[in-house]
Amino acid sequence: MKLYGSFGSPFTRRVGTTLLLYNLKHEHLVLRANVPEELEQLKKFNPLARVPALETDDGMALVDSVTILDYLDRLVGPDEALTPSTGAVRTQMLSLIGIGAGAVEKSVSCYYEEGVNAKRPADKIYRPWVDKMYEQTKDGLEAVESMVKGPWIMGNKITQADVSLVCFLDFIVKHRPETAPQLNCPNLEKISKKANLMVEFSSTIPA
């Protein structure tokens, strides 16, 4: 398999980390949509030129991290999958991850507005909208924080909830300016610190 994308994307990172946790043989090729020569190559696997994209061993191109993770779960089987295949716990986990994904998407939007690689001129930024997105990021993460059930998010063992939320939280913390409302997520921060000691996480931390 071949994973396309940069670990600077929290969505690419969660796929890369999952591949390592599943011990699935793969090649990681760094392709970034904001680099013109890499953009054209990326379009071969995703017409939207978004990351991540996964090329399976039989040549199928999968796009969107949700689709890719579902494929990997089915590949390793229900006994090894980090997401339950059925039941209420699956629904709870996917809902929780969905909140986290929404929070990091708001953070990504803020990054494009006023981050290092901002796309919009400073005088064209609509401050009330950006401030609202920072607030939504905070509210989303703190909602997930309130759902933590043990040493890992869902209880006593690591699941896809931890993989995804660690990748999401790390991106948010790295790119959140000091002027934004302070996050209050001690349990998620503790889980992130613990997870990032594992080689499967530490080897996907972006530079």
Model-found features: residue ranges?
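Residues at alpha-helix termini
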Residues: 22, 45, 175-176, 199
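GST-like domain detector, emphasizing the conserved glutathione-binding G-site
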Residues: 1-127
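Surface-exposed helix-capping loop/turn segments at secondary-structure junctions
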Residues: 78, 146-156, 199-205
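Generic structural "secondary-structure junction" signal
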Residues: 44, 84-85, 154-156, 181, ...
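Long hydrophobic alpha-helical segments typical of transmembrane helices together
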Residues: 180-207
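GST-like fold's C-terminal all-alpha helical module
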Residues: 100-190
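Non-transmembrane alpha-helical segments in soluble domains
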Residues: 69, 73, 94-97, 141, ...
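Short, contiguous strand/loop micro-motifs
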Residues: 1-3, 128, 178-179, 203
